[in-house]
Design a protein with these regions (language model features):
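A short C-terminal boundary segment appended to hydrolase-like catalytic domains
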Residues: 55-149
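Short N-terminal signal/transit or membrane-insertion segments
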Residues: 1-11, 135-144
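Conserved beta-sheet core of the metallophosphoesterase superfamily
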Residues: 2-64
Length: 149
């Protein structure tokens, strides 16, 4: 990951508003640099790998949907704002992978134990992606602002 970090920092230092990498198919930490956002892996919303197994250390069935807002400044240049949503892939009745916003799954959970597990997963993925605890965040939000450091 060190070489990916160095590459991301190089690109943001040289004008990129965001660098989005992808390798492990697992959500990895992102960092807000003075020049832009470096997200090293957003997960895997396209594949089936891992959605039928529970692995507390990987949670391969979770992904990040990154929201990147760019606005041209009147004096030149571009301003950026970043936020994200958490998605979870689950198998439907036909055995096909379907991705849902985690917020929707939490709201529709029929059992308290299921809802509590989804909330624990939400806190885990939030911390894995941002490096920060979710404690003071509106956990029912569909879109989380990327925390400022």
């Amino acid at each position: 990951m060190q070489s990916a970090r160095e590459l991301g920092l190089f690109f943001t230092k040289n004008g990129a508003n965001a660098v989005i990498g992808h390798h492990e198919h697992l959500v990895q930490i992102a960092e807000l640099t003075p020049n832009g956002l470096c997200a090293y892996c957003l997960g895997n919303t396209l594949g089936y790998h891992g959605i039928d197994q529970r692995d507390e250390h990987r949670l391969a069935n979770y992904s990040i949907i990154l929201h990147l807002y760019l606005q041209r400044r009147s004096g030149g240049g571009i301003s950026s704002r970043y936020s994200f949503s958490i998605a979870k892939c689950v198998a439907n009745d036909d055995g096909h992978a379907v991705c849902h916003l985690l917020n929707d799954l939490i709201k529709s959970a029929s059992e308290d134990a299921e809802r509590e597990q989804l909330l624990r997963d939400q806190a885990f993925i939030y911390k894995r992606f941002t490096g920060q605890d979710i404690d003071n965040i509106n956990r029912s939000a569909v879109e989380f602002p990327f925390p400022q450091t």
